[in-house]
């Protein structure tokens, strides 16, 4: 059960990292101040 949770977290993290990298390449300021971009 724990293994499933860990695998899910890893897949989510990798997915989020991919999205963040794409956003960062398009908008460099996203990494600098993500809060302003989200709100």
UniProtKB/Swiss-Prot annotation:
PROSITE patterns: SARS_ORF8_IG. InterPro entries: ORF8_betacoronavirus, SARS_ORF8_IG. Transmembrane segments: none annotated. Coiled coil: none annotated. It holds the Pfam family bCoV_NS8. Keywords: Signal. Residues 16-39 form the SARS ORF8 Ig-like domain. The keyword Signal applies. Residues 1-15 form the signal peptide. This is ORF8a protein. It comes from Severe acute respiratory syndrome coronavirus. The lineage of its organism: Viruses, Riboviria, Orthornavirae, Pisuviricota, Pisoniviricetes.
């Amino acid at each position: 059960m724990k293994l499933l949770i860990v695998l899910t977290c890893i897949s989510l993290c990798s997915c989020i990292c991919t999205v963040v990298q794409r956003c960062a390449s398009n908008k460099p300021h996203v990494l600098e101040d993500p809060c302003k971009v989200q709100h």
